[in-house]
Amino acid sequence: MKRAAFLFIIITGIVCFAIACARSDEVRKTEATLYFVDAEINRLLPYTCELIDADPQHMAEAAVEMLIEGRDDNDKIRRLIPKDKSCISTRVDGGTAYVDLSSDITETLPYSRDIEKLFIYQIVDTLTGIKGIRFVKFTVDGVVKKDFMGYYDMRETYKFVYPE
């Protein structure tokens, strides 16, 4: 009887340990806000989505990928970022996201101060909404430039502007 009770306790302990240590197949996700330009090109529209809960670098890459993918199914949103994954790359270091833009993007954007502002802050407001990112700095083709389209100083450090 003692032997059976002892075996029962040991087996129960092993099962409990195995259950506690079992890896969950469930992927943890976190809510994020992406900003898209409205159809009239007047303002940014917040769009809530879920990103895989990871470090800021991976979350920034996923958010930028979603911005590039766009919301073409929504007629209230206008695409400013071309649907080309090589047009934007990101790197996160010390709370700052470094965003490298391809100069080819300017070929698809109409020249306007408002459009440049919406384009920049669509990226800035999306990235600064990610835990661990407070600021955004831009380069164009890997080089820090004075401006992107002639209106905004790309040497600046940008932070969140548009409240929800």
Predicted regions and their residues:
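Bimodal "functional hotspot" detector
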Residues: K2-I11, V15-E164
